[in-house]
A protein has these predicted regions:
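Interdomain "pre-motor" coupling segment immediately N-terminal to P-loop NTPase/helicase cores
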Residues: 1-50
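Conserved helicase motor core of SF1/SF2 NTP-dependent helicases
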Residues: 58-72, 76-186, 190-273
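Conserved loop-to-helix interface motifs that mediate assembly, gating, or partner/ligand docking
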Residues: 38-68
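Generic recognition of cysteine residues
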Residues: 12, 55, 245, 279-282
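Positively charged, low-complexity/disordered segments
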Residues: 275, 279-288
Length: 288
């Protein structure tokens, strides 16, 4: 074959061999990602990612950043008081945030973990759902529970929750509180209003760290309602101590088909945005 291609293949195989020697089981996803990195002469980054162990799950599986974007996200969390992780489904933004929070909690960097998300999504209103408040909010918080169970184990999670050291609650429960010495994660932040986002960010006390995650393409807010995440991106971009990390379809670590779906929607949204821009220019040009 072509000499350049052969050399590229050798480098990729060398990195995969290094991963294997480190005790990793090489997956098709690893192969595809090393190939993608090699196109940008960054194939050696895969070994650097493998060196960044955040924690282990209850089953002993290591939790590490799997892409360059995820590595950047984890580094920004470590270096800032408030980090916004923005990206599509499957990029690991919430799971990695959970892993970072649990690691900080285990090492006594913080005394508790607080996880929250807006309770109203997909057009549903809690007042019209059957059951008591806990049963109403649980479905909205289930993804957070799932990640905690996987990393901590159900028994450890329940014990810490009973002691008040881990709290999983709707965003409305944050009002009027000051959250000191805590690791706080706001998930699905695209479904907050600007007032809710401001309320949340002003709850932060001394010794706390905050991660805000969201996907600006998946808003469930009523038509015409601004997203608190969009406003925060505009207002807080230059505030020291706050970082914004944008994950993309390149950082999707679920089934390869999910990555293709995300990419297809990115193209669609780009076309829609361009159509709106052109339409706005035309209306402006022809208006009296």
């Amino acid at each position: 074959g072509d000499e350049a291609n052969v050399h590229q293949a050798e480098k990729c195989l060398g990195q995969l061999k290094e991963l294997s020697l480190r005790g990793n089981e090489i997956t098709a996803q690893d192969v595809n990602y090393v190939l993608a990195l090699s196109m940008e002469d960054q194939e050696s980054a895969i070994v650097q990612l493998d060196s960044d162990l955040i924690c282990n799950t209850i089953n002993g599986r290591p939790v590490k950043p799997k892409t360059i974007g995820q590595k950047k996200y984890v580094d920004q969390i470590r270096g800032n008081m408030i980090t916004f992780g923005i990206g599509p489904a499957g990029t690991g933004k919430t799971y990695l945030a959970m892993a970072m929070a649990i690691t900080a909690f285990r090492s006594d960097e913080v005394s508790r973990i607080i996880l929250t998300r807006p309770a109203i999504e997909a057009g549903e209103n809690l007042g019209f759902l059957p059951g008591d408040l806990q049963s109403k909010v649980d479905p909205y918080l289930r993804p957070l529970y799932d990640a905690l169970y996987q990393i901590m184990g159900a028994e450890s999670f329940q014990k810490n929750m009973e002691k008040g050291l881990i709290e999983v609650a709707p965003l409305a429960y944050m009002r009027g509180r000051t959250l000191d010495n805590a690791y706080i994660i706001l998930d699905e932040a695209q479904n907050t209003t600007p007032a809710q986002m401001k309320m949340f960010l002003t709850r932060i006390g001394f010794g706390s760290k905050v991660i805000v995650t969201g996907d600006v393409t998946q808003k469930d807010l009523p038509m015409g309602t601004k997203s608190g995440l969009d406003v925060a991106l505009q207002v807080l971009k230059k505030v020291e101590g706050i970082s914004f990390c944008e994950l993309t379809s390149k950082d999707v670590v679920r089934h390869p088909l999910v990555q293709k779906i995300v990419q297809a929607y990115e193209v669609y949204e780009k076309h829609r945005s361009e159509e709106r821009r052109v339409g706005k220019e035309c209306r402006s040009r022809w208006s009296p």
